[in-house]
UniProtKB/Swiss-Prot annotation:
It holds the Pfam family Guanylate_cyc. May play a role in cell wall modulation. The N-terminal domain exhibits lipolytic activity. In vitro, hydrolyzes various p-nitrophenyl (pNP) esters. pNP-decanoate (C10) is the best substrate, followed by pNP-octonate (C8), pNP-laurate (C12) and pNP-butyrate (C4). Exhibits lower activity with pNP-acetate (C2), pNP-myristate (C14) and pNP-palmitate (C16). Can also use tributyrin. The C-terminal domain catalyzes the biosynthesis of cyclic AMP (cAMP) from ATP. It has a guanylyl cyclase side-activity, corresponding to 7% of the adenylate cyclase activity. The C-terminal adenylyl cyclase domain forms homodimers. Homodimers are asymmetric in both unliganded and ligand-bound states. Its EC number is 3.1.1.-, 4.6.1.1. It comes from Mycobacterium tuberculosis (strain ATCC 25618 / H37Rv). This is Bifunctional lipase/adenylate cyclase LipJ. InterPro entries: A/G_cyclase, AB_hydrolase, AB_hydrolase_1, AB_hydrolase_fold, Nucleotide_cyclase. GO terms for molecular function: adenylate cyclase activity; hydrolase activity; manganese ion binding; protein homodimerization activity.
């Protein structure tokens, strides 16, 4: 495998006269719209390992949609500050959802940009499946009826000196406040500075920070109907946990989970408990340490031209053909010691302990189903997977599974296509392969070398 830098294609959605930059990764059954972090544009996310891993975990169970809101990063700059703020940033999010064909999404709303998510859930209830607020607030500053907010005199340095390039030299280190566990990491600090520069010049940072500091969206909380998960680190001093408790008290049916930690930046520190809560909230299944991990060879099969076959045969004859296909494939999987873990449309997903067994099984399946007048495409990859139901082995998940599915999608009729990982493991065996070259796999970082099984020269096991 030739691994390239982690690059996701940036596209643009139109929001009035604004161009809103966005990226998509993963292809899970649920859309997860990740609102921007604090002055971290989307083209900087994958350059920071902890943030990259956090988003990859999200993409293992959802389709992640992330964006730069207007005024920041790759999105359009503004002529006037009057078009900044939670209401306008919510419009940016809707424009991106429309551009990617997302009718409804779970909204991931971190820190002070949580206010955008709160407005989005209240103003566009039909577009919000659920809401996740992380270290967020409905208002940053103190008010007589909001004592958990920061006093203006304490907030002022964050709106002035903190936004200047020489802030640390002038004695104000914002990173030590928002992410104390990585404040001493020179590599992280260099990335943080570069991300801030990419986000925009100090004038943009001052304008955005001023709008956020003056925002107050408490009036929308009573209108939020979507299921809401509120996650807040109890040791955060930048956005104290009192903000999260206020949200929980004022959003009907919401659930507050107080997590250990001092970092306001959601992707640093101990992220395991946070990610487990998010995955369980979205999927109903808690991943992480509660899921059994194992090394496996994953095989995907798919009937070529199934829609055309179904139209030509009619429902009854097509159903009979599918039954015969399923019987044949199940028999071959069992014969080679595999385990069926899921069905995928008109195909199967199976795991094997041996890559050679998976290849031999795939080889036989191609020939066996040909007697039915159909062809299949098969993709095989090997890697670590999560067993979702460890006691029964009923399903598997993880990046390796996504790779297997993508390899299968690139296979031609009656082809067995494998990743170079599989080819390298079985080097020296009777199986021979032809190079297919490096390919991009949708939702998977880097470029992957693929190989096709040379079936005509293979030694058959029958």
């Amino acid at each position: 495998m030739a691994q390239a830098p982690h690059i996701h294609r940036t596209r643009y959605a139109k929001c009035g006269d604004m161009d809103i930059a966005y990226q998509v990764l993963g292809d899970g059954p649920t859309d997860l719209l990740v609102l921007p972090g604090p002055f971290v544009p989307i083209d900087s996310i994958d350059d920071e390992p902890s943030l990259y891993r956090f988003h990859r975990r999200l993409a293992s169970f959802s389709r992640v949609i992330r964006l730069d809101h207007r005024g920041v990063g790759l999105s359009s700059r503004l002529a006037a500050i009057t078009t900044l703020g939670p209401k306008f940033w919510a419009q940016d999010a809707i424009a991106v959802m429309d551009a990617v064909g997302c009718e409804q999404a779970t909204i991931f709303a971190p820190s002070f940009h949580a206010m955008n998510g709160l407005v989005l859930a209240a103003d566009y209830p039909e577009r919000v499946r659920s809401l996740i607020v992380v270290n967020g607030s409905a208002r940053p500053l103190w008010a007589p009826d909001y004592p958990v907010g920061a006093q203006v005199r304490r907030a002022d340095p964050f709106l002035t000196v903190a936004l200047e390039p020489d802030a640390v030299e002038r004695g104000f280190d914002v990173l030590s406040i928002v992410a104390p566990t990585v404040a001493g990491d020179d590599v992280f600090r260099a990335w943080w500075d570069l991300a801030g520069n990419r986000a925009g010049p100090p004038s943009i940072a001052r304008a955005v920070s001023k709008v956020i500091a003056e925002a107050d969206v408490r009036d929308v909380l009573g209108h939020i109907e979507a299921p809401t998960l509120i996650l807040h680190r109890v040791g955060s001093t930048y956005i104290p946990v009192g903000h999260g408790r206020y949200l929980a008290e004022h959003i009907a049916g919401s659930r507050l989970v107080e997590l250990p930690g001092t970092d306001t930046l959601y992707w640093v520190g101990d992220t395991g408990p946070m990610l487990d809560e998010i995955e369980e909230f979205i999927t109903g299944v808690r991943g992480g340490a509660d899921a059994e991990r194992m090394l496996a060879t994953i095989m995907f099969t798919d009937i070529v031209g199934s829609t055309q076959h179904a139209a030509a045969l009619g429902d009854d004859r097509w159903r009979d053909l599918l039954d015969n296909h399923d019987t044949i494939v199940c028999h071959e999987i069992q014969r080679f010691g595999g385990r069926e873990v899921n069905t995928a449309g008109d195909g199967f997903v199976a795991t094997f302990t041996s890559p050679s067994a998976a290849i031999a099984c795939a080889d036989d399946i191609v020939d066996a189903v040909a007697a039915l007048g159909i062809e299949v495409r098969i993709g095989i990859h090997a890697g670590e997977v999560e067993v979702r139901d460890a006691s029964h082995g009923t399903d598997v998940a993880g990046v390796a599974v996504h790779i297997g599915a993508r390899v299968c999608a690139l296979a031609g009729p009656s082809e067995v296509l494998v990743s170079s990982t599989v080819r390298d493991i079985v080097a020296g065996s009777r199986h021979r392969f032809a190079e297919r070259g490096e390919q991009e796999l949708k939702g998977v970082p880097g470029r992957w070398r693929l190989c096709v099984l040379m079936r005509d020269d293979a030694t058959r096991t029958r």
